[in-house]
Amino acid sequence: MPTITSYFGFLLAASTITPALLMGLSKIRLI
């Protein structure tokens, strides 16, 4: 079970961090 929980947590973190990085890159490109 811990492995599934950690995997789900990693997936959730990736789904929240990826959009933030894309937004940062788009802002840098606009500037």
Swiss-Prot record:
* Subunit description: The 4 large subunits of the cytochrome b6-f complex are cytochrome b6, subunit IV (17 kDa polypeptide, PetD), cytochrome f and the Rieske protein, while the 4 small subunits are PetG, PetL, PetM and PetN. The complex functions as a dimer.
Q: Name one Pfam family in it.
A: PetL
* Name assigned to this protein: Cytochrome b6-f complex subunit 6
GO molecular function, a single term = electron transporter, transferring electrons within cytochrome b6/f complex of photosystem II activity
Q: Which UniProt keywords apply?
A: Chloroplast, Electron transport, Membrane, Photosynthesis, Plastid, Thylakoid, Transmembrane, Transmembrane helix, Transport
Q: Which gene encodes it?
A: petL
Instruction: Family membership, please give it.
Output: Belongs to the PetL family.
Can you tell me where the transmembrane regions are?
4-26
Lineage top rank: taxon: Eukaryota
BP GO terms, sorted: photosynthesis
Record bears the keyword Protein biosynthesis: no
Q: What is the lineage of its organism?
A: Eukaryota, Viridiplantae, Streptophyta, Embryophyta, Tracheophyta
**What role does this protein play?**
Component of the cytochrome b6-f complex, which mediates electron transfer between photosystem II (PSII) and photosystem I (PSI), cyclic electron flow around PSI, and state transitions. PetL is important for photoautotrophic growth as well as for electron transfer efficiency and stability of the cytochrome b6-f complex.
Looking up PANTHER family in the UniProt record yields: CYTOCHROME B6-F COMPLEX SUBUNIT 6 (PTHR37266:SF1)
| Bilayer topology term | Single-pass membrane protein
The UniProt entry, under InterPro entries, shows:
Cyt_b6/f_cplx_su6 (IPR007802)
